[in-house]
């Protein structure tokens, strides 16, 4: 079974099959990005995060982002996965990998994919704190950036 080029997962992200799926003989560069759940934000101690996703729309838009990146940066392949549900500190919330003939294209393509995911996907993040009530945090796509 082939891996999807973009996916939303309620399970921890296993990067090894993703990296293996990106391997191709024409590629001279692999660049990956992993966004982790950190233990602080805006001076508050974060206990965990919760992501809610409009899944169908997010997947459709995610595939568009991957296609755009492949065309714009001449990538041989690109894959991205974003988590949904409740995540603990240190867990991977989002993972992006791209391959290209040269490193500059792979770096630029990876940055494009993560930037567009944060900008365009209907994903909402709620931070759970130790000493404060849980709060939904700013999402770029709600503000017409």
From Swiss-Prot:
Stored Pfam families: MoaE
Protein name (Swiss-Prot/TrEMBL): Uncharacterized protein slr0903
Superkingdom classification of source: Bacteria
GO terms, biological process: Mo-molybdopterin cofactor biosynthetic process
GO cellular component entries: cytosol
SUPFAM superfamilies tied to this protein: Molybdopterin synthase subunit MoaE (SSF54690)
Record-stated family: To M.jannaschii MJ0717.
InterPro entries reported for this sequence: MoaE_sf, Mopterin_biosynth_MoaE
Organism: Synechocystis sp. (strain ATCC 27184 / PCC 6803 / Kazusa)
């Amino acid at each position: 079974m082939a891996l999807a080029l973009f996916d939303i997962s309620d399970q921890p992200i296993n990067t090894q099959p993703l990296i293996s799926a990106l391997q191709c003989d024409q590629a001279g560069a692999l660049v990956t990005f992993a966004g982790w759940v950190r233990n602080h934000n805006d001076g508050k101690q974060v206990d965990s995060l919760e992501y809610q996703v409009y899944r169908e729309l997010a997947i459709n838009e995610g595939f568009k982002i991957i296609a755009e990146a492949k065309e714009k940066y001449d990538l041989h392949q690109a894959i991205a996965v974003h988590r949904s549900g409740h995540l603990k500190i240190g867990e991977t919330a989002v993972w992006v990998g791209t391959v290209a003939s040269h490193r500059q294209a792979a770096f630029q393509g990876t940055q494009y994919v993560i930037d567009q995911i944060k900008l365009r996907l209907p994903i909402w993040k709620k931070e759970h704190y130790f000493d404060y009530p849980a709060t939904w945090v700013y999402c770029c796509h709600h503000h017409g950036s």
